[in-house]
Structures are given as structure tokens and as C-alpha cells.
Regions:
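C-terminal motif of bacterial Sec signal peptides marking the signal peptidase cleavage site
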Residues: 21-23
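Short, well-ordered beta-strand elements
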Residues: 32-42, 99-104, 121-124, 169-170, ...
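N-terminal lobe/hinge region of extracytoplasmic solute-binding protein
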Residues: 39-94, 229
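Aromatic- and charge-enriched surface segment that lines or borders ligand/interaction sites
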Residues: 53, 87-140, 170, 321
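Gly/Pro-rich hinge or "lid" segments in bacterial periplasmic/extracellular proteins
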Residues: 73, 177, 185-257, 261
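Alpha-helical secondary-structure segments
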Residues: 118-124, 166-170, 260-261, 278, ...
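Surface-exposed binding/hinge segments that line
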Residues: 120, 137-210
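Ligand-site clamp/hinge motif
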Residues: 242, 248-294
Length: 335
């Protein structure tokens, strides 16, 4: 399928690393800081990495957090995994057929100055695998040894993810999967989280919910993004119902390749189009196919880009427990 988008909005794909923001048009604010404003659709449904399903939500989180690996464009425009929060990774094939990956972290820091540790990844991955959280992205870790047992028993310590030291993370897979680094270790769902921060913000949210009024929305630990502690190139500095502003995370420890200030605007497609035409924002996504097709004919700054996407159908039907029925359905498909 094709996703139609503006030339200036190429940076919005969740598979594109933050460095591509330099390819977008940048403006300078009154104080000389480079800034970029982007419309990303509806107001985010969540800032919790294990629940973020919308591309807009994932795009924001991709700028707030940094995973073990990140994606870059390699030869033939293929996405390749390169070190992110990790500075190196080693792979060892074991005699029982399992494969062990050892990640050595680069010594990055969270936005509050605390060191990023291997335990932050252990906590995040165990939280994702926990059946109690009910994340649709949990199967990402199904190739990790102990995942099935953890899912069945609820004992997340069975997941073969451990901190050998504060800067060494060890992950054992059930076998060899060449897409592990590219797909799992760059995913929004496996981004690191600070357990102490999540627990503190959750306690505060629960306390606020005790006095919740009938017409108020229950608070979650992530409800105020400006209080999130992040390890990526940006941290949230301001939020209202129409936009979220990110500013450079000075504790990030790497040279920032994008603008110092990044604003994600929220609204419907019509609002986004008006803001773009008025020069309020630099890029918009998404628009309806009709609007985009019309604009492409009249505006040379538009172009079509192919995007690879995979969709799956999850059946919640007891009749499909019968293997013969599933085989019959499979035979119907003209391959």
C-alpha cells in the first residue's frame, strides 16, 4: 500500500530515526534556536511505550526514548540496526540451540541525570511480557527464552533477560532470529523505563484518582508527559490540548542532529491543512487520500512514498480451536 505524505514529513515514519529531522525545513526562534512544528493527527491516546499503537503516538515516543538499537538507512535504502543506547552487541550460539546476545550500554543518562542501566531494560521487557499488562506487543518477546513460561505463570522473572552489571544486558533467545536486533531492539514497546519513576508517578496518579470527579478522566502514570523521565534526544517541556513541545535533552550525551525545539500539533486533517497553508506548521500527517491527491496535482512539494506495512487478523473464536477448521480456511486462500 502507499502512504501519501508531504516531502517535509518524511521524518514522521516511526521507522526513521531522529537524525532525519535535519532533512525537514527548520526555522529559528527569536532566541536563535532551531525549531520544527509537525501535525501528527489526533491527541495521543497514551505515552506508555507498551500501549502506543498509533503512528503519531509512536513518533513522539521515538523522540523521547532511545532503545538498545536504532534504525538507519543502509545500502539499497534498507533499514539497518545500529547501536543506540548500547555501544556494542555480541552474539553467541549455545550448544542447546539457544542464542545469547550481550549488550554493553554506552553510559547514557536519563533526563534527570541518572545513569541508564541494564536494569531499566530488564524492567521494561519484563513489564511488556507480563500477562497482567495485556500489551498487544508482548509477542515481540515470544522468541526470548522463558517467555511462554512467564505468560503461563505470570512469573516475569522467568524471562531470559538479565542485568549482568549496570552496563551489561544479557538476552537469551530460543533460537537464531536475524531480525531480533532490527525489529525487537528498535521497537517502541521495548524502550527502557525507570521503575522508580513509573511507580512514583503511578502512586501519584492513583492518589489523584481517589478524589476524581464524575466528569474527569482518570489519570495514568504517563498523563503528564512533562513529568516523564526520558533517555532519548528530547524531553517534553510543555503540553496543552493542542500541542506537545519537546526540547533538547541536555543529558542525552550525543550530539543533537535535529532541531533544539520540536512541537507536535494535534488536530483533525482539516485543521492540519489550514495550519500548513498558514505557515504555522512545517509538516502535516495524515491527510485524507482525496485531499492529498488533489494537493499533489497542484503542489510540487508533494510526492508519494511506498511504505511497507504488515497487518494481521487475530481471531477470538472458539470454533477456530479445531485444527481441521483452520486448515480448511487456509486452503481457501489462493496462493
Amino acid at each position: 500500500m502507499k502512504l501519501w505524505k508531504r516531502l517535509t514529513a518524511l521524518c514522521l515514519s516511526v521507522l526513521v530515526c531522529v537524525t532525519l529531522l535535519t532533512a525537514c525545513g527548520r526555522k529559528e526562534s527569536a532566541d536563535g534556536r532551531a525549531s520544527l512544528s509537525v501535525c501528527v493527527g489526533e491527541t495521543p491516546a497514551t505515552y506508555d511505550p507498551i500501549y502506543a499503537q498509533r503512528i503519531g503516538d509512536q513518533t513522539i515516543l521515538n523522540h523521547l526514548y532511545e532503545n538498545l538499537m536504532r534504525l538507519e538507512t543502509g545500502e539499497n535504502s534498507q533499514a539497518i540496526a545500529v547501536p543506540g543506547a548500547a555501544k556494542s552487541v555480541d552474539m553467541k550460539e549455545n550448544s542447546d540451540g539457544t542464542v545469547t546476545y550481550t549488550f554493553r550500554l554506552r553510559g547514557g543518562k536519563w533526563s534527570d541525570g541518572v545513569e541508564v542501566t541494564a536494569s531499566d531494560f530488564v524492567y521494561a521487557w519484563q513489564r511488556l511480557a507480563d500477562p497482567a499488562t495485556g500489551s498487544v506487543y508482548a509477542p515481540l518477546l515470544s522468541i526470548v527464552s522463558g517467555y511462554a513460561e512467564a505468560q503461563a505463570s505470570g512469573d516475569i522473572s522467568l524471562l531470559a533477560v538479565s542485568a549482568k552489571s549496570s552496563t551489561t544486558l544479557v538476552v537469551t533467545l530460543t533460537g537464531h532470529y536475524d531480525w531480533f536486533l532490527r525489529e525487537v531492539c528498535t521497537s517502541i514497546a521495548t524502550m527502557p523505563l525507570r521503575q522508580d519513576v513509573v511507580q512514583r508517578l503511578k502512586q501519584e496518579a492513583d492518589a489523584a484518582n481517589d478524589n476524581l470527579k464524575e466528569d474527569e478522566t482518570p489519570r495514568r502514570w504517563w498523563s503528564d508527559p512533562t513529568r516523564l523521565v526520558t533517555n532519548g534526544p528530547y524531553t517534553a517541556s510543555a503540553e496543552d490540548e493542542n500541542a506537545l513541545t519537546l526540547t533538547e535533552n541536555t543529558a542525552y550525551g550525543k550530539k543533537l542532529t535535529g532541531p533544539e525545539d520540536l512541537t507536535f500539533c494535534f488536530g483533525d486533517t482539516q485543521t492540519a491543512e489550514v495550519l500548513y497553508d498558514q505557515g504555522v506548521v512545517d509538516a502535516v500527517w495524515p491527510l485524507t487520500e482525496e485531499e492529498m491527491a488533489e494537493q499533489m496535482e497542484a503542489d510540487e512539494t508533494w510526492q508519494a512514498e511506498p511504505v511497507l506495512e504488515t497487518y494481521s487478523v487475530m481471531f477470538n473464536c472458539s470454533r477456530l480451536e479445531d485444527e481441521s477448521i483452520r486448515k480448511a480456511l487456509s486452503l481457501v486462500i489462493d496462493r
